[in-house]
Amino acid sequence: MRKLFTIVLSLVAFIGISVSTANAKTLKCQTVLNTKADEVKMLKDFTDTVTTLTDGSLKFEILPAGAVVGVKETLDAVDKGLIDCGFAWTHYWSGDHPAAMLFGSPVAGGGVGIDNLAFLSWFQYGGGKELYDQLWKEMGRDIKGFMLQPVGPEALGWFPKPIKDMADFRKYKFRTPPGIPGQTYKDIGIASVAMG
């Protein structure tokens, strides 16, 4: 892959090579969240660890959603080199490829049917990582995805009153990722607003 992020993180994670700080590089990483989100704080912990492991030769500038491009354009911006890396859930791009639902935190589980430990085992040892790489190729993106923070399925929601039937359910408006989740809500007559 042509992305420096891929090469350097692969070396750091698997070989442990340290590079001189004279060749320091700062990678711009745009998230799909604001910088106060817990997930972004965990991302900063990860990038701080990478900076420590590389003796300061690799640093990250974490940018909030929309800093360079809109949320929906984050993946394309990485592919085109406008930003060095992005941080999001893969299911944001399920509208581009339905298999993206397998690798994110789909609303209400999205039919995956396994817990986080089983998911991590499948990803690491059961062929999931290879399918993840194949996903990006099939989407025509020249990127390398890394799994950080597998969070499992998102909750369907928190409601002020019990939902007794679909008529009750259709009274609500949902925030949802673009792609399959948003389309599913639309197909069953529920108003949804795509994130981003």
Description of each model-found segment:
Residues 1-9:
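Bacterial N-terminal signal peptides that target proteins for export
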Residues 14-24:
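Sec/Tat signal peptide C-region and signal peptidase I cleavage site
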Residues 26, 57-61, 173:
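Residues at or immediately flanking beta-strands
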Residues 28-45, 65-69:
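Extracytoplasmic "Venus flytrap"
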Residues 36-61, 179-184:
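Short, polar/charged alpha-helical segment
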Residues 45, 52-53, 60-78, 116:
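Extracytoplasmic small-molecule ligand-binding "clamshell" domains
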Residues 47-51, 79, 84, 89-195:
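Contiguous mixed-secondary-structure segments that line small-molecule binding/active-site clefts
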Residues 69-70, 194-196:
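Short, glycine/acidic-rich beta->alpha junctions
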